[in-house]
C-alpha cells in the first residue's frame, strides 16, 4: 500500500521488526484479513490444553480468516468429546498426552498451540517440533532461560517456527503508541510505569504451585509489564533491581511470588518501575513519560477494550478480539513469512525469561543485576 511507505524508517531498536502503520493502514490490513474473498493458505491449528484460556482462543478462532482450529490434545477424554462437538473436530485430529507424537503423520495439522501449565511448555514444544509441526507457546514461553533455550534450539533443529502468544503485540492502540514513539513524537523517553495485578482465587490452582507455574504472579501477570516496558520504551534493559513482599505465606509458598516491585534500567537513560501482584485488584496500566509528551494505556492488557490516550488526545482505534487478530497474524508469519511489527518469536520469549531470571536473582541477592540481551 502506498500510504504504508510514509512510515518506512530505518529503526535501531531490536524490538521493532517492521515499519509501523498509520491508523488507516492498520484498519485496511484488518479489513483485508476479514475479507470473504480471501482464498489463500489457512493455518490449521491443534490446541493442547483445553482449559479456560484454551477455550477463549478456540472461540476467538471462529472469526479468523487465515487460521482454523482443526485438532485437540488433552489428557481429559471428556473435554475432547465436548470440544469435538462444539468445534467440529474430527476424531482423527484428537490426541492425548501419550500419543500426540503421532501427529507427525497427520498432514491436516500445521501447528500446535500449547496452552498448558508453564512448566509443561518445554517438553511439549520439543515433542511437537520433533513431529515437524510449528509451535505456538502461550506466555511465558517456559519457566526459565535454560528451558527456553532448549525450546528455541529444538525448533531450529526441526526447521519449524516457534512463536509465543503475545497477543498485545497485535493490539491497535498498543501499536499506535509504539508508532508515535518510534516516529519521535514523544521525544526522549524518560520513564515507564507498569502495574499488573489481580487478586487470585482458588489456592489449589496450578498457578500457585511452583512445580507447574515456575513462580507466581511474575510468571503469569508481571511478564506483561516486562514486555510492555520493552516495546513501549523501544530498548532492551541493561540492569534490574527487585524487591518481594509476602502477606500470605500459606497461600504463596516458597518459590511462589505474591508481590514483586522491580525496576529496569535502559541504555538511553529511561527507567521502568513495575509492580506484579496476586493480591491487589484493578492493576492493569502502562504509562510512558517523555520529554515532549506521554502515553497511557489503562486497561493495558485485559481482554476487554484497551483504553488509551496520549498528550495528543484519546486513542480511538476500534476494539478487536485479541486472540482472533493474533492467530490470523501468526498464520501470516508461519505460512507467508511475514514479520510482525513487534516480534513474537522464540528469541523474543527468551528475552523476557532472561529478565524474569534476573528479577528473581536480584531479589535473592538484594543487588542490582546486569542484563545483556
Residue locations for each model-derived region?
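NAD(P)-dinucleotide binding in Rossmann-like oxidoreductases
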Residues: 250-259, 264-328
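Beta-loop-alpha module in the N-terminal Rossmann-like domain of NAD(P)-dependent dehydrogenases
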Residues: 92-154
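N-terminal Rossmann-like dinucleotide-binding module
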Residues: 11-88
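C-terminal helix-rich "cap/oligomerization" subdomain common to oxidoreductases
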Residues: 8-39, 111-113, 332-373
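Predominantly a Rossmann-like dinucleotide-binding segment in NAD(P)-dependent oxidoreductases
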Residues: 53, 168-253, 366
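Rossmann-fold dehydrogenase core element
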Residues: 150-167, 187-190
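Hydrophobic residues in well-ordered beta-strands that form the structural core
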Residues: 137, 143, 162-164, 274, ...
Amino acid at each position: 500500500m502506498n500510504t504504508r511507505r510514509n512510515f518506512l524508517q530505518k529503526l535501531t531498536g531490536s524490538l521493532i521488526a517492521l515499519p509501523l502503520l498509520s491508523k488507516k493502514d492498520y484498519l485496511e490490513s484488518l479489513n483485508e484479513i476479514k475479507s470473504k474473498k480471501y482464498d489463500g493458505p489457512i493455518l490449521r491449528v491443534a490446541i493442547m490444553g483445553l482449559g479456560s484460556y484454551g477455550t477463549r482462543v478456540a472461540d476467538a478462532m471462529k472469526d479468523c480468516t487465515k487460521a482454523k482450529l482443526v485438532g485437540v490434545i488433552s489428557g481429559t477424554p471428556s473435554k475432547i468429546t465436548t470440544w469435538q462437538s462444539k468445534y467440529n473436530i474430527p476424531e482423527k485430529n484428537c490426541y492425548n498426552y501419550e500419543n500426540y507424537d503421532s501427529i507427525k503423520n497427520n498432514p491436516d495439522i500445521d501447528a500446535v498451540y500449547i496452552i498448558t501449565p508453564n512448566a509443561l511448555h518445554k517438553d511439549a514444544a520439543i515433542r511437537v517440533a520433533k513431529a515437524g509441526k510449528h509451535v505456538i507457546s502461550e506466555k511465558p514461553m517456559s519457566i526459565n532461560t535454560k528451558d527456553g533455550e532448549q525450546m528455541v534450539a529444538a525448533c531450529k533443529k526441526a526447521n519449524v517456527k516457534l512463536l509465543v502468544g503475545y497477543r498485545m503485540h497485535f493490539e491497535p492502540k498498543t501499536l499506535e503508541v509504539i508508532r508515535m514513539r518510534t516516529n519521535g513524537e514523544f521525544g526522549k523517553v524518560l520513564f515507564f510505569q507498569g502495574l499488573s495485578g489481580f487478586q487470585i482465587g482458588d489456592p489449589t490452582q496450578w498457578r500457585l504451585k511452583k512445580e507447574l507455574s515456575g513462580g507466581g504472579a511474575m510468571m503469569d501477570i508481571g511478564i506483561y509489564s516486562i514486555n510492555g516496558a520493552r516495546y513501549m520504551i523501544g530498548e532492551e534493559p541493561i540492569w534490574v533491581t527487585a524487591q518481594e513482599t509476602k502477606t500470605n505465606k500459606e497461600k504463596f509458598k516458597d518459590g511462589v511470588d505474591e508481590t514483586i516491585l522491580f525496576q529496569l534500567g535502559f541504555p538511553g537513560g529511561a527507567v521502568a518501575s513495575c509492580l506484579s501482584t496476586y493480591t491487589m485488584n484493578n492493576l492493569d496500566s502502562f504509562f510512558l513519560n517523555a520529554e515532549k509528551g506521554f502515553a497511557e494505556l489503562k486497561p493495558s492488557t485485559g481482554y476487554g477494550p484497551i483504553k488509551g490516550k496520549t498528550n495528543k488526545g484519546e486513542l480511538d482505534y476500534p476494539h478487536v478480539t485479541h486472540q482472533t487478530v493474533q492467530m490470523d497474524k501468526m498464520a501470516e508469519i508461519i505460512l507467508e513469512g511475514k514479520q510482525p511489527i513487534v516480534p513474537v518469536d522464540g528469541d523474543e520469549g527468551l528475552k523476557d525469561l532472561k529478565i524474569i531470571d534476573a528479577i528473581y536473582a536480584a531479589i535473592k541477592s538484594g543487588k542490582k543485576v546486569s542484563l545483556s540481551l
